[in-house]
Every structure is written in C-alpha cells, then in structure tokens.
Amino acid sequence: MGLEAFLPVALVIGYLLGSIPFGLVLTRLAGTQDIRSIGSGSIGATNVLRTGRKSLAAGTLLLDALKGTVAVVIAGYIAGPNAAMAAGLGAFLGHLFPVWLKFKGGKGVAVYIGILLGLFWPAAVVFCLLWLATAFTTRYSSLSALVASFITPMFLWWFGHLALSALFAVLTLLLFYAHRENIKRLQSGKESRIGEKA
C-alpha cells in the first residue's frame, strides 16, 4: 500500500480512536449519573468536572488528549506527516461525532491539544498558556478554548507550518461549531463558569 493510499485508513483509525467516550466510560465506572444528563450534556472533561469529581475530570482530559496524540504518532510513524494529519482529523471527528453515541460527542478541546502535541508540541504549549490565561481572567472554559483555538492556526502559519495551519483552521471551525450553544450562553450571560456543579 502506497503512503497516499494509507490516508483513508489513517482517517478511519483516527476516527475509531477518537470515538472512544472516555468521559462517559470513567463516570459510569465510578457510579456517577450519566454525564450526558447534566450540565452541557457533553462527554468531555469540563462537563465531568461538574460532577464534582476532579480526578475523573483529570482522567478524562488526559485520555481524551491521548486519543489525538496516539492517532497522529502511530499514523505518522507508519506513513509520514500527511497520514498523521489525516489521523488527527479523524480523531477529532470521532470525538465530536462518535457513531456509538448517535454522533453526539464532546467539544474536542482535549483532543485538539493532543493532536497539537503529536504534530507540533510548541503550539500545544502556546494553546495551553492561552487557555490558562483566559480561564484565569474569565473562569469560562468555553471562552478559553475558543480564544486559544482561534489563535492556534495563526501561530502555526507564522512559523511556516502551512499545512498544519490549514488543518487546525478546519479543526477550529469544527470546535466553534461544537461550542455553538456555549457561544449563545456566553452572549446571554448564562454560561457556567469553571468549577460550578451541575
């Protein structure tokens, strides 16, 4: 199989990895209520935090990020950078639209970071710093993610990573789409702040 022919395979493998709903799995194993029935209904770490279980939220964040990192590292090792980017896109789509949960998944922030970490780690550091700075000043997880993801493609472009910049521009658009309800709540002043329980 040629390297270019591997791209669809990388996309599918990435999707399958990304579609593993770690937030839902961890909260069920811990005996908490269905994470989809509280807060934003998302299966991601921020919504898991609303259960009051910080350890579960941290575990969800780590495992969701690893989905993106593992996908791009494995695909890149097998078939090069284009396959890595395809796997990253697949992992992101899998997390947002998992077939096992009727295509209703998470918001994609942790996976976004994990993909960045696997493809160009300095950008992941910048993303996290931007997220932390925004979260510290506003205490809005959603706004922090929107700000950090908006700047990430420009950061990649500035340092000459044009293909990565294009990929993350697409991922940022998808992330904004996943946060569309959060954006509405931010505009109306009804968005939950970090640490608030459901």
From Swiss-Prot:
GO terms for cellular component: plasma membrane. GO terms for biological process: phospholipid biosynthetic process. GO terms for molecular function: acyl-phosphate glycerol-3-phosphate acyltransferase activity. It comes from the Bacteria. It is found in: Cell inner membrane. Signal peptide: none annotated. The chain crosses the membrane at residues 6-26, 56-78, 83-101, 113-133, 155-175. It is a multi-pass membrane protein. InterPro entries: G3P_acylTferase_PlsY. Keywords: Cell inner membrane, Cell membrane, Lipid biosynthesis, Lipid metabolism, Membrane, Phospholipid biosynthesis, Phospholipid metabolism, Transferase, Transmembrane, Transmembrane helix. The keyword Cell membrane applies. SMART domains: G3P_acyltransf. The keyword Membrane applies. Pathway: Lipid metabolism; phospholipid metabolism. Pfam families: G3P_acyltransf (PF02660). Catalyzes the transfer of an acyl group from acyl-phosphate (acyl-PO(4)) to glycerol-3-phosphate (G3P) to form lysophosphatidic acid (LPA). This enzyme utilizes acyl-phosphate as fatty acyl donor, but not acyl-CoA or acyl-ACP. Probably interacts with PlsX. NCBIfam families: glycerol-3-phosphate 1-O-acyltransferase PlsY. This is Glycerol-3-phosphate acyltransferase. It comes from Bradyrhizobium diazoefficiens (strain JCM 10833 / BCRC 13528 / IAM 13628 / NBRC 14792 / USDA 110). The gene is plsY.
